[in-house]
């Protein structure tokens, strides 16, 4: 408890707090730009923190991490274009809320529930580090294979009534993921003699292309007088709509948010997972247990609440395995491990 108190007060020293704010601002810029991510931001800016003290440098990097995950939801909500995998599930309901003129409400919900999820993840990191880390350590190849099958089965759940389309989209995604060099045999797959295809296709490139370009083409196709009137009506509704969820809506989201925050923190502690898996699982399970599942995917308040909470609660879980076992929970913590080593710290049990 004494060490925890000392750490808490050290955060609010002038220099550490300043660098934390600096990292948050940098993360906001990085998180809202399609094609960038928290991983790329930390990897690019880490060399600029070498002249800082370890506490100051980690304040910058952790500020970027948390802020970029939150800011990723802004593009997902406003233009239906997730800039990182973690914000994919926020497009399910967030963009529909914007289409209904609830822009302020959607953005404020993203902020509120992201903070709630981040705090829940922090509690897990502080209180449950060792139990969660021991659980994650038990995950071997059979468990990872089972989780992969579970992830594939989620395609049917999130596709609604269009099961065939969901299966087809999943098959195309698996096909694209096999492009490049086979990591086991070294043989080339679907490169068609193009050496630039050896490294495969980056997930972010596919994601921005599928969501971003598709949304641009969709908006171009809607250019008509009738659609202009609808957009004007949506703008008027946006000016008059409530900026925050109603008390009844907030009360109804407490239990789903609490459950999904806890689940996401545990998922984040499992190596190889991330905010995208946690958010989609939480969205689907909340829909399954909802009294009004037909509202999900059409601007449901709980749909946006649990996804915003989930992709931020994952951070605490991912940091748990990184700090206690030295095993990165996701791509961002893999880069953070390298940063800690450069500061002279070795993540793992010896840190405790």
Pin down the residues of each PLM region.
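Re-entrant/interfacial helical elements at transmembrane boundaries that shape
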Residues: 38-48, 61, 76-96, 126-127, ...
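Hydrophobic alpha-helical segments embedded in the membrane of multi-pass proteins
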Residues: 21, 25, 41-43, 62, ...
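Membrane-embedded alpha-helical modules
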Residues: 108-224, 340-352
């Amino acid at each position: 408890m004494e060490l925890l108190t000392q750490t808490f007060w050290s955060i609010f020293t002038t220099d550490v707090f300043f660098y934390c704010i600096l990292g948050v601002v940098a993360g906001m810029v990085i998180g809202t730009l399609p094609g960038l991510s928290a991983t790329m931001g930390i990897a690019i800016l880490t060399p600029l923190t070498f002249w800082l003290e370890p506490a100051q440098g980690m304040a910058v990097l952790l500020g970027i991490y948390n802020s970029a995950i939150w800011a990723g939801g802004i593009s997902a909500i406003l233009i239906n274009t997730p800039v990182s995998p973690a914000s994919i599930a926020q497009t399910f309901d967030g963009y529909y809320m914007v289409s209904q003129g609830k822009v302020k409400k959607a953005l404020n919900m993203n902020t509120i529930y992201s903070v709630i999820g981040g705090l829940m993840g922090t509690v897990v990191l502080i209180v449950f580090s060792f139990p969660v880390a021991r659980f994650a350590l038990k995950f071997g190849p059979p468990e990872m294979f089972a989780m992969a099958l579970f992830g594939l089965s989620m395609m049917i759940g999130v596709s609604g009534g269009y099961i065939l389309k969901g299966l087809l989209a999943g098959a195309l995604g698996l096909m694209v993921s096999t492009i490049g060099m086979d990591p086991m045999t070294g043989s080339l797959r679907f490169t068609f003699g193009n050496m630039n295809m050896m490294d495969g296709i980056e997930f972010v490139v596919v994601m921005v292309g599928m969501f971003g370009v598709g949304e641009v083409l969709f908006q171009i196709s809607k250019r008509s007088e009738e659609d202009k009137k609808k957009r004007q009506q949506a703008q008027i509704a946006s000016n008059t709509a409530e900026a925050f969820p109603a008390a009844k809506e907030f009360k109804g989201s407490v239990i789903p948010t609490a459950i999904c925050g806890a689940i996401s923190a545990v998922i984040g502690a499992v190596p190889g997972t991330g905010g995208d898996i946690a958010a989609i699982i939480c969205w689907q399970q909340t829909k399954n247990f909802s009294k009004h599942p037909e509202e999900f995917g059409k601007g449901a308040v709980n749909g946006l609440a649990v996804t915003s909470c989930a992709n931020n609660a994952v951070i605490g879980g991912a940091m748990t395995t990184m700090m206690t076992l030295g095993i990165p929970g996701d791509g961002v913590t893999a880069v953070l491990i390298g940063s800690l080593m450069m500061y002279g710290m070795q993540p793992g049990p010896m840190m405790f």
